[in-house]
Every structure is written in C-alpha cells, then in structure tokens.
Amino acid sequence: MTHSNRMLLGVNIDHVATLRQARGTRYPDPVKAALDAEEAGADGITVHLREDRRHIQERDVVVLKDVLQTRMNFEMGVTEEMMAFAEKIRPAHICLVPETRQELTTEGGLDVAGQEARIKAAVERLARTGAEVSLFIDADERQIEASRRVGAPAIELHTGRYADAQTPTEVAEELKRIVDGVAFGVGQGLIVNAGHGLHYHNVEAVAAIKGINELNIGHALVAHALFVGFKAAVAEMKALIVAASR
C-alpha cells in the first residue's frame, strides 16, 4: 500500500502473542491489539508466522484476515509450508524474511543476491495470489538490485544496525546507509519500506527520510503499551512519524 502524501505506520503485533505464549493462555489477544491499533491510526497490521510458532499462531492469522479494516502484512520464511498457507489466506501484503542461518546476510536481511532463483520462484508464486510481495533486506545496493531482478515490487530495509548503533558516529553512518538505500531503491522503481528495532527515541531520523513508504514497528509499541495502553502507544508513535515526515 502506498500513499503519496504521508508515511505509513505498520504495527507488528507479534510480541502481544509472545506474552500470551509465555503461559499458553488465551490472553492477551493479538487480534484485539490489532483492532486497537487500527483505531489509533495504524495503516496496517504486520504478523510473522514463524516455523517454530513462538508467537503468532495460524488461528491468529485466519481471524485477522477476516476482521482487519486496514490490511495485513504477512511476514514469512521461504518454505513450502508457508507458501501453501499464504496461498490459502491470501493476505494483501507478504514480506519474505530470513528464518535460517543460510538465508541471512551478515547484517541480518534476506540474502536475495545469494539465492536469486529460489526467491524469484517464491515471488512469482505468491504474486499470483494478488499480494504485493516485499523482501526484507539490508540497505545494500547488491541486495536491492537483486530484489528488483527477482520481480519484487517492494523491499523493507532492515534498520536493526541503525537501532543498535552505540556512538554518534556509528548512528550517523548507519543512518546514511539507510538514506542511500532508500534513494537507490526508489531509483530502481521499488516501493521502499523500513523497520526493525525502531522505537520512540530513534524513529524520527528514519521517518524524516524522503522516499520511505511505510515503517513497521512492533516491540517498542508493545513495551510502551504496558504503561500507557496499546491505543495510546500507537497514537504516540503515529504522531512522531507524521511530524517527522512532513
């Protein structure tokens, strides 16, 4: 989903499910969190159904598909099980993410350049469901070019190294890497999203980057929601992004 005038906020609700799975209870319900997030201004809801099912479960995805008023961004590993599930659910957006060490780059994104044929086949198969397929990659020209070559219309740039940077120099270097990656991706004709490790104290610099379509944020929202409530946590983040991206 793109919007010409403003940056979008995708709310990842995985860690609401993490809290539920810690005790194997029926609460807290990630579906309720998703609906609250939408009410508070989320432009979409992101869920990652992992092979180990450590947080989100199939049932969550099925229910969310039926009740969301915005759209679902379904994160998944490149496996036959997940491909078949995505074909059944048919989410609006699918983001392919690395789940095994072989699929990872050194920074942590999907190594598209190292497995182009496999990723191309997955992108083509998933595109037939009508989904917009994106690839979660590092802000690296080689990976961005490979993403275009395999036919993905969108990418999500991994902001984890920026989030983990310790010194002002490191922060500036990692931010420049993202800025350059966004410009390169847009120049390649791709929709460029970003996310991973973003929180209330580091999001503004990324939200100020021209060319980013959407930021996906989860853990920081769930953590802040413990103290202010989920709607307030989402609304606060949305306000930061809107102000910074003007």
From Swiss-Prot:
Residues reported in the UniProt entry to bind 3-amino-2-oxopropyl phosphate: 12, 23, 197, 218-219
Locations listed in the record: Cytoplasm
Main location per the UniProt record: cytoplasm
GO molecular function: pyridoxine 5'-phosphate synthase activity
Pfam families: PdxJ
Reactions this protein catalyses: 3-amino-2-oxopropyl phosphate + 1-deoxy-D-xylulose 5-phosphate = pyridoxine 5'-phosphate + phosphate + 2 H2O + H(+)
Enzyme Commission identifier(s): 2.6.99.2
InterPro entries (UniProt xref): Aldolase_TIM (IPR013785), PyrdxlP_synth_PdxJ (IPR004569), Pyridoxine-5'_phos_synth (IPR036130)
Site (Transition state stabilizer): 156
HAMAP family according to UniProt: PdxJ
Protein name: Pyridoxine 5'-phosphate synthase
Organism for this UniProt entry: Pseudomonas putida (strain GB-1)
Gene: pdxJ
